[in-house]
Structures are given as C-alpha cells and as structure tokens.
C-alpha cells in the first residue's frame, strides 16, 4: 500500500521483486513523473539551493537553509491542494501577516515544515520522484504495467493537480487485474490524508475481497 511516492515504490517492487507483494494498492500516484511535476519540483530544489545558508549542501544541521526549504514547501503545497478548496477557504480574503489570507496559510505551512524536515533529504526525495519511470527496462509504460500480475487497487483523488486522473486511469487500464476507485474530495492530492473514512471503506472492501478469493 503506497500513496504518492509510496505508490511509485510499490510499482517498482511489483516489477523488480514481484515475490515481495501479493497485492498492490496504488494511491494518488503515477507510472512516470510528468514534465509538469518535474518542473515544479525543480523550482522547489532551486529555492533551497538559492538560500545562502544552503552552502552547497554542507550546512550545519543547526543552521539549515530555512527560508529556501520553507519556500520549497509552499511551492509544493500549491500542488497538493485544489483551487476549489483554496477558493472556498480563502478566496481573496485579506491576511493578517500578508496581503491575502492564502499567503498567510502558505507561510504557516512552510514554517511548520522546516521544524521537522531536512533540506538535503527534501532534495534527494524530490530527485527520486523525478527519476521515477517504470518503463525503464521495458519497451513502454504499457508493457511494464501489463507485466504486473498482482491484484491491484488504484485510488484516485478528485481534483488531484499533482498526478492527474488520466495518469492514474492508465495504471488501472493496463495492469491486467486492476480496479479503479475515485474518491470525491475538494482536497486534491492531499485527499488521501484527509478523506480517511472513504479511504478506509475502499481498502477494507478490496482486502476482504482478496482474502475471500485466496
């Protein structure tokens, strides 16, 4: 079971070490990082590297590039949520610290993140996601997916701006024994962290069916 990057790792296990997985649950993920996703994550890494405290990655752990990492998180967070949610929650309302409430919210998310994450780790994870492409060693993405034999559940979140419904439908279309569920949500990609009841119901049904068919 893997959401986002975890889903990418689950796909790789299914392809490279198939005996490790009896079934797959791929949540808000993709077979290949898109050009748009690569562009966004590249800007996030640039924000970190432009921080004077980055020091080419050789910063002291007590003085990491906080401003750059906070900005990277803000850039990422825009892709994690949807315009529908932002409009309903913030619209063009005035902020307390900035001109607009949405700016205050993004600043809060950035500051919260730097208290629990390391900049170099963030860069490495970002590069890992950019390199994700299951077609490596196969003639195409489709042929790679067709080689996956495990029962598979693909879960998409409505309004996911990071990994589109089309990308996730491709997984379900070409994996031979796959089913696809779409969770209605205004929270976009982060819906898998928020729509816990819907997620739980879908997972419970899939795992029960697998147990009954074993």
Residues of each region from the PLM?
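Alpha/beta-hydrolase-fold enzymes
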Residues: 20-22, 26-112
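Catalytic active-site module of serine/aspartate enzymes centered on a nucleophile-bearing elbow/loop
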Residues: 169-170, 177-214
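Active-site nucleophile elbow and catalytic-triad environment of alpha/beta-hydrolase enzymes
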Residues: 108-109, 124-144
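Short glycine-enriched nucleophile-adjacent loop
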Residues: 7-18, 24
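Short alpha-helix in the alpha/beta-hydrolase fold that links the catalytic acid
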Residues: 137-142, 150-151, 161-173
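Conserved alpha/beta-hydrolase "nucleophile elbow" surrounding the catalytic nucleophile
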Residues: 2-3, 157
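Acidic catalytic loop of the alpha/beta-hydrolase fold
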Residues: 112, 131-133, 158-163
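Short beta-strand/loop motif that positions the catalytic acidic residue
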Residues: 148, 154-156
């Amino acid at each position: 079971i893997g959401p986002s990057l975890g889903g990418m790792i689950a796909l790789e296990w299914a392809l490279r070490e198939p005996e490790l997985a009896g079934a797959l649950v791929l949540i808000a993920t993709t077979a290949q990082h898109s050009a748009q996703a690569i562009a966004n994550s590249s800007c996030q890494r640039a924000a970190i590297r432009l921080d004077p405290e980055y020091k080419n990655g050789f910063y002291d752990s007590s003085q990491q590039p906080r401003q750059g990492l906070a900005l990277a998180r803000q850039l990422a967070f825009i892709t994690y949520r949807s315009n529908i949610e932002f409009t309903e929650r913030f619209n063009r309302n005035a902020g307390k610290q900035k001109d607009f409430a949405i700016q205050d919210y993004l600043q809060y998310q950035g500051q919260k993140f730097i208290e629990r994450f390391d900049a170099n780790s963030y860069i490495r994870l970002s590069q890992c996601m950019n390199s994700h492409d299951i077609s490596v060693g196969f003639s195409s993405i489709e042929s790679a997916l067709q080689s996956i034999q495990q029962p598979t559940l693909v879960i998409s979140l409505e309004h996911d701006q990071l990994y589109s419904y089309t990308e996730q439908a491709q997984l379900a279309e070409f994996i031979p024994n796959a089913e696809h569920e779409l969770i209605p949500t205004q929270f976009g990609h982060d819906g898998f962290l928020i729509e816990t009841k819907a997620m739980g119901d879908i997972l419970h049904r899939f795992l029960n069916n697998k147990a009954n068919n074993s």
